[in-house]
Amino acid sequence: MSSSSIHTTEGSTPNTAGGMGKEPYSNVSGSQRSSDTLKQQKFIVSDAMAKNSRQLLFAHIYNYLVHNKFYSTASQFLKEVEVPLTTIENIGKIKENTVRDDSSQMRYDDIPENLLRPDMLLNASDTFLVEWWEIFRTLFDHVDGIPNESLDSNGNQEVFKQRIMAILPHNNPTVPPPFINGAENLVDPERHMNIARGSSVSQPSGVLRSPTQNELLNNSQDQRPPQFRSKSMMNGMPPGLSSMSTPNGVEGMQGNFERPTFQQSKSAALPTQRKSSIEEQANRNSSNFSGFGSQSPKNVNEDNEIDSKSAKGKLRSKSSKRGKVGKAAGTPKYNEVDEKHSTMQGSPFSPELLGSNNPVLQNQSKPSAQSQMNGSQWDPNFLMQQQRNPQQWQKLNGNNMQQDIPNSSHPSIGSNNPSNTSHRFNSRRKEQYDSKPEAIGNGSHRSSTSPSAGSVGNMSADYGDQNEYGSNKSSNFSGAFTNNNAMFQEMAKTMNLMMNQKSEEMNQWNKSNPYNMRPDNMPMSTMNWNNFPMPKGTSNSFNKDMLQAMQNKMMQSQSSSGMDPNLQQQYLMMMNMLMNFQSGNGFQSNPTNVYKSRGNDLDFAQPFSSENNLANDQSNIRSSYEAYQEDSKTPSTENGGRKMNMTPSLQSTNMISNGQMKHSTSRFSPTHGAPNQSELNKMESTQRGNDISHNYNPPNNRFVGNNLKSQNFSLASQDESVIAAAKKGRRKLTKLNKRNLATPESTSNTNYPESNKNGISTPNGSVGNKGKQTDINGHSNYPDNPFELFNI
């Protein structure tokens, strides 16, 4: 054994004799620490001399190796670890003071000379450390007997892996925290401090308990009206407290409180309040009433009496019996409220219930006459009447005409408060207003299949300052969008969701696609866009409302003094992108991809060049509405007596292509996008396999052929070569269409939708084919409602 067999350094203290105070080989230098030297001094390995559990383990392992005659391993083990050593003299003294097990005495006559003789107090098989070693040895032997191919498999690797749970929870940075930025979580810090300090309300001992701080804090975050809060604690008042002397105590627990009055009987009359408190409260409430477009109360009760029924939450009014509004304790009652100008009668959002410190009431401004029309500006009849009869429109607005519409009294509709923007895009509110027809403006009705007028109608009047006649001021129109930025922010979110999110529905569509092709490289003439889903996380109703709102804003700009061309071009760009995705076309950054997938049925229009060009294009929208009204008055016999119920919003919206308004009365003409017979035969034979007699499936979105020209017109309009190629292909397609129209029998085998005398395509095809067309999977290509193509 070399000098490194025993791991002791020069000058270090070797193992002692377990409290005997004698160093076994302290007189042996480092150069003399060899196996011969140790043997001459009769050193042995003993578990009794172990200083710690590590040395105890090494001693038993060494004993186990020697006992089982693993001499080579024991020799290597003795070189690498530090085992407890002692001399024979010390062992003799230990034996005298220790009861040893005779079974632990072993014969080491055949031990090699290079090994030390172990002398253990316990046998190796009696120690738990050696039992662990035996278990590991058995496991190692088992692993050595398994082929390497089996060990490399994933199944066997999982057996040796130990699952360790993390101490800290997993914090995913992409997942937002579960915190709702609502009114119930936004509490005034000053109010928190007042509640923490406690109120100065004196309470009689033995009658009521004092409210705890947790009750006050929990109740302070409750921003509901008082009559909807818990009865145990309302606005910081202790249970059983009927009233307080000042209204300030009801609103925010601020100010000095007098001794409250506790009523044992419900029928007992409340004490008389001071006149100054009533006048102060009346002035505050009158200012809140003006925020909803109503006048201040005319008469206040001069007797300063509060009826006992007011404690039960009843607000009595002589002139109005439409509804009774609950009233908080300590507030005055009104004898009369002007019914002609008030929109708050019967509404649960009265200032008494919400309190004057409500942020919705503080940010509320008087609605204009146009916003009081409650969504009627989306109706084309109403817009035409406004243009043809401006004096009548001015007369109506001068009279401040009111309509009994649910959203007229709602604080989140028709307001300039940016915090209420989310209400305007709420699909639940849209379904509520679309559930039944309501009277709007000029006698028109909205149905469940039409775009939401309740949630979208007022949207166009929500941005920008307005004059007394309801039209936007041109000086503040673009600035309002720059300041509020609400619509553009929502549109940006929608764009990001549409372009960046790869949803599970997209993968499902790829699996179910019979051609196993993606929509971006698939010919649009063979796409079944009903099976193409919207991206996960986007709302169809939101996209529809966004399109409707942008179209309303553009239509509204005609009655105003103009609109910034740059701003309107941004509108058109976003509308075109939203419409293309709604129709299933998706977004493409390279405009040349459009030619690869669409063929020759494309033409690009130039963007605005001047404000005069913009005005001319806007005037074409009005004429298109008139043409639509004439076409939709009488049903046509060519389409089976079916009348096309098209809403004007999409009528004008789909005429927008490449940043320019295009006037077209024949919007659904089959000449745009219809391939000839040779192209059909080639397409059917290559993509459908062997059967050419299948019905040809045109794109479900019949708006794509003529109106939605480009995927990214901002790039295409700048590429002159692309525009030139598009015009050239357009001329070629026109010749093909003329030939196809001259010989209609050439396309008789294809059930491409016919058009009536007005140029409007019928969803059910020609007269001879009354049934709906189906694709190879049996799915209907043409729904009953043509707006289902836009997921509307």
UniProtKB/Swiss-Prot annotation:
Residues 428-437 have a biased composition (Basic and acidic residues). It is found in: Cytoplasm; Nucleus. Residues 1-16, 197-233, 355-377, 397-424, 444-458, 468-477, 646-707, 743-767, 774-783 have a biased composition (Polar residues). Residues 285-294 have a biased composition (Low complexity). InterPro entries: LisH. Keywords: Activator, Cytoplasm, Nucleus, Transcription, Transcription regulation. Residues 311-325 have a biased composition (Basic residues). Belongs to the MSS11 family. This is Transcription activator MSS11. The gene is MSS11.
